[in-house]
């Protein structure tokens, strides 16, 4: 097995929340750099879990286009500010957060009342300004998930007066990678993979690359011991199931049904022993009855009888 090393060549904090890390993975065989880089990038961006507010209830507010007396921001601006709040959650279950502030005051994420399983990455994150002695009261639902969810696709089971919020669960904002050729010795050329990761502060770039690699490892491990079943084997099982169906399932007319029964045709398996030509040889079984059976087989089971007798 080829051995390679991974090294963090740069790490820094960007602003109040963002974290950045740059990593080098080498030496890789030619072609493996782009394979590994692309797989890691997609996994890190789409498969890592993050935490976000998904629904909000504000006292006295019925819809997102409302205004709140004594509060500088309208409801839509408050929802947009809440969308920017970054959480770190140690629990997969949905949580409820609350805040109750009497003004005048500046409302920030650090004033949220949260369970011990959740923490705010940036307590200084601005939410709203209360201009007078108005009481600002809000309740919100927090979930852990992957990717991005639009408000109209969310389903809130708590109450009809919760406002849905577009939720960004992705803990990683951006991933870049590039592949460089590295000469080792006089004849050997290897790939060097450089990965840059920007996170929202809820996880570190090191955690992001580790979790992304774990997702890929679990994905590929499941392919190691697959029990491949041939399509022919699958079809034979399906055919066996269909053949055991009784002719009553075809819902034929009384005349056609009685003719088949008198000919000792009780199941689809019995019927499949006949061609269209042979059906007409059954006593009192005319062209109309034959067409009825052929149509029912095709419509209900997707089966076509051969037109002529097999040699």
From Swiss-Prot:
One of its GO terms (cellular component) is chloroplast. Its main location: plastid. It catalyses: RNA(n) + a ribonucleoside 5'-triphosphate = RNA(n+1) + diphosphate. DNA-dependent RNA polymerase catalyzes the transcription of DNA into RNA using the four ribonucleoside triphosphates as substrates. InterPro entries: DNA-dir_RNA_pol_insert, DNA-dir_RNA_pol_RpoA/D/Rpb3, DNA-dir_RpoA, RBP11-like, RNAP_asu_C, RNApol_insert_sf. The lineage of its organism: Eukaryota, Rhodophyta, Bangiophyceae, Bangiales, Bangiaceae. Residues 1-227 are annotated as: Alpha N-terminal domain (alpha-NTD). The keyword Plastid applies. Its EC number is 2.7.7.6. The gene is rpoA. CDD domains: RNAP_alpha_NTD. Gene3D superfamilies: 5' to 3' exonuclease, C-terminal subdomain (1.10.150.20), DNA-directed RNA polymerase, insert domain (2.170.120.12), RNA polymerase, RBP11-like subunit (3.30.1360.10). GO terms for biological process: DNA-templated transcription. SUPFAM superfamilies: C-terminal domain of RNA polymerase alpha subunit, Insert subdomain of RNA polymerase alpha subunit, RBP11-like subunits of RNA polymerase. This is DNA-directed RNA polymerase subunit alpha. The N-terminal domain is essential for RNAP assembly and basal transcription, whereas the C-terminal domain is involved in interaction with transcriptional regulators and with upstream promoter elements. Keywords: Chloroplast, DNA-directed RNA polymerase, Nucleotidyltransferase, Plastid, Transcription, Transferase.
